[in-house]
Amino acid sequence: TTIIGGALVRVLGHLGADVVRQNHLGDWGTQFGMLTQYLDESPDAGWRAAAGDISMLNACYRAATARFGVDQAFADRARRRVVSLQAGDPATLATWRDLVAVSQRAFQALYDRLGVLLTPADADGESGYNGVLAEVVDALVAAGIAVESSGAVCVFFDDVAGPGREPVPLIVRKSDGGFGYAATDLATIRHRVSTLGADRILYVVDARQAMHFRMVFATARRAGWLPERVEAAHVPFGTVLGADGRPFRTRDGDTVSLGGLLDAAVDRARTVVGGKNPDLAEADLARVAHAVGIGAVKYAELSTSRTRDYPFDVDRMVSLSGNTGVYLQYANARVHSILERLPAGTERTVDTGLPLHPAERALALHLDEFGAVLAEVAASAEPHRLCGYLFALARLFTDFYGTCHVLRAQTAGQRANRAALCRLTGNTLSTGLGLLGVQAPHPL
């Protein structure tokens, strides 16, 4: 979600949109209720003594989840803890704030490592809307949009039903008095439209939430909080898979952390880069391995149609052939090494009135499509279109450079045209990789 959202933010901003980044940190749903209750009941967990170590909290969360699934009394206490949190219980709030602080530090370290644009100022979690949730629910009830059902307040839909045709509601207030995610999502829509003035809202969230967002958007439109002039879209994404075709996990069944995936990619990139450039100084090798490894993971995510699942194959990700970030980084470095050999004052535009070699024409036509591709990415929220374009550009440039002499061109006009194509290709590759959030170091 962070990698895809980061690329969309960059592309939209590049095209002139006023983009507001919002990161949904500060969640306090059932998961936080489970964890808070578990920590209160497990004083020996030692998470505070571990200086807020996120791995310690992850272990506690796994234990809380396991207990929640088998201990009904604990599950009930955890649910009541969520209600206490939403009601402003001081002790629960204090623990929650500590947990959020630990999470934010861990996330920010990953964001910085990934080179995404999110900062602590972009955090906009559920807690920020707690004070208006009752008002949101009351407004839905008063408008006849939400009704009470089995003690909960729900919104029903004529076109949404379960496998047995039973109605599937959107629960805005649970039977225990707590507010569900739907109430928060509705409050955020109202705020983003009425206060932030949004004309397009993109939710980069797991594909499994498709039905939830369909119902939330429909409810917001019925309530008048999401007028027709405003687009709200769920931008779903698939799952990273292991070699067995299942969601990527460690041997003991735990989900693999993003940090662990990045470590593996950087280590493998170091081997590949070091093998190709054995004379690189240690500091340069570390710098390039970081750029290549992180870029490889980001590009693998972005180059796949975002709704598809894809395997985490670090060897393929850092391959120097095929549609990989490393291939494009090396293509970009190669183009810039050529540019450094061009004389000063080289033309930057192509004179289409001169005869063009087929490889020149193909490259020029492809370069001309860059703006249209960016517009497609912005409209569809599909970064893989840009990846495909850049991969094709790199291949076309390879064909061009292999068949068309630049410095030894037959005429001055031909030499100027080919130099301009080199410069335009370099600028486009650098810009495109930058919009994907992939570093383009040169030399490599």
Please tell me what each predicted stretch does.
Residues 1-444:
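Non-catalytic interaction-recognition regions
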